[in-house]
Amino acid sequence: TINDLKTVTTDHKGQAVTITKDSKIVVRYTAKLNDQAVIGSTGNSNTASLIYSNDPNSTGGGSKGETPKDKVAVFTYQVVINKVDQDKQTPLKGAGFTLYKKDATGKYTKVTEIAAGETTTFTFKGLSAGDYKLSETQTPAGYNTIADVEFKISAEMDRTSDNPTLKSLTATATSTNKLTFTSNITDGSLTANVVNKKGSILPSTGSIGTT
């Protein structure tokens, strides 16, 4: 229920607003998902309707009606990174990752960071569609740090249904260093293995060598 509605007399250009019986009124609002949001195909539903009266006073006794309920859903996703040895199977401890998302200006801003520890699986929850960058900020001892991985999360929803559903979910690498993601629409997960290799990185021409 919205209780703090304001009287509108002019639009955003300062022009007088005239409302007739044929006027179409659109109410827009924003909301932020919290840590209790459901991840995956179930989505987070929101139902809206308008109760109206032919009496202009909110406390009046005129007849009332209600518009048909309109249901929408907001979907959120998770990226799951499995850290593995160069055999591409053995879990590898000692890594830490930071996930960034590209904003409207094209700049990457930090979403969250997971520090190194005993875990070999890193789960980044509460993500939306968009462009991301994964950086290995801590590397297992004796292994080479991987290059940053940039990828794009894309999703399609059935927006016209009375029960909105998630139709597709993909993540595609957009950088030279590529990851292959496996998608699971049900739990909203995009999973990839990140491989670390042992040894020294060969120096570039003219640079100081490593041992």
Predicted regions and their residues:
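Solvent-exposed loop/turn and edge beta-strand elements of beta-rich ligand-binding domains
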Residues: 1-211
